[in-house]
């Protein structure tokens, strides 16, 4: 991964060190190669499902799926797509909680390859560095654009921000609907799953933790 940005490499190494990286096989194939091979395999899957790929509604489906997988919903598997990060010196000496609520995310369950649809709340208490607010949203999106389990996703966002900000004082909460529960199996259309990962003062200080949890509930 020698061509990656410094920030992407640091985050990847931090996740590997903590055993939190998504299981990956090594260097990814070239983008066009991935698309071509996924298209070929998806063509075979659709034929096995007895679908007529000569139909004008289906003929482009394998190609569309290949492009969607590589360029969109699984683009976070490739650290070349890690967002450009703006880290700013904390010249104003901000030492209070910074919270971004209701970050929309769409991910994919790695067990059944169906949708996870949810929102994230992310907070941190700055030390020497602050981050452009939109970059938090982009980091959430990057890690969501992978086959995921929600628990790992929550921790990946936490560790990425801790690494980039140089502080343990980060908290992440995700509330999401899993379509592997909603659309198959038990088919529960109303349940949601909440996961929380806390670091630094968010873990050790009851007051700080409660302030964050109130923000998650919008009771601020």
Swiss-Prot record:
Spell out the molecular function terms from Gene Ontology.
GTP binding; GTP cyclohydrolase I activity; zinc ion binding
SUPFAM superfamilies, sorted = Tetrahydrobiopterin biosynthesis enzymes-like
Cross-referenced Gene3D superfamilies, in alphabetical order?
Answer: 1.10.286.10, 3.30.1130.10
- The portions of this protein that span the membrane are none
In terms of superkingdom, the source organism counts as: Bacteria
Q: In which pathway does it act?
A: Cofactor biosynthesis; 7,8-dihydroneopterin triphosphate biosynthesis; 7,8-dihydroneopterin triphosphate from GTP: step 1/1
Instruction: Cite a single Pfam family from the UniProt record.
Output: GTP_cyclohydroI
What is catalysed by this protein? GTP + H2O = 7,8-dihydroneopterin 3'-triphosphate + formate + H(+)
Which residues take part in binding Zn(2+)?
A: 109, 112, 180
* E.C. number(s) listed in UniProt: 3.5.4.16
Oligomer status and interactors: Homomer.
Q: What is this protein called?
A: GTP cyclohydrolase 1
The scientific name of the source species is Edwardsiella ictaluri (strain 93-146)
Q: Taxonomy-wise, where does this protein's organism fall, top ranks first?
A: Bacteria, Pseudomonadati, Pseudomonadota, Gammaproteobacteria, Enterobacterales
């Amino acid at each position: 991964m020698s061509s990656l940005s410094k920030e992407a490499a640091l985050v990847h190494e931090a996740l590997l060190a903590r055993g939190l990286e998504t299981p990956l096989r090594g260097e990814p194939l070239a983008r066009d190669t991935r698309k071509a091979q996924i298209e070929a395999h998806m063509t075979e899957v659709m034929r096995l499902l007895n679908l007529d790929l000569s139909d004008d509604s289906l003929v482009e489906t394998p190609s569309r799926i290949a492009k969607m997988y590589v360029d969109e919903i699984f683009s976070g598997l490739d650290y070349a797509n890690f967002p450009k990060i703006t880290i700013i010196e904390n010249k104003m000496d901000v030492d209070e909680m910074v919270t971004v609520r209701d970050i929309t995310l769409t991910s994919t369950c790695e067990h059944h390859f169906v949708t996870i649809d949810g929102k994230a709340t992310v907070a941190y208490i700055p030390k020497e560095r602050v981050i452009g607010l939109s970059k938090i949203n982009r980091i959430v999106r990057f890690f969501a654009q992978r086959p995921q389990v929600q628990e790992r996703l929550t921790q990946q966002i936490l560790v990425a921000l801790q690494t980039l900000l140089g502080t343990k004082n980060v908290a992440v909460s995700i509330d999401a609907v899993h379509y592997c529960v909603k659309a198959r199996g038990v088919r529960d259309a109303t349940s949601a799953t909440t996961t929380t990962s806390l670091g630094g003062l968010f873990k050790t200080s009851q007051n700080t933790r409660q302030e964050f949890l109130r923000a998650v509930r919008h009771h601020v």
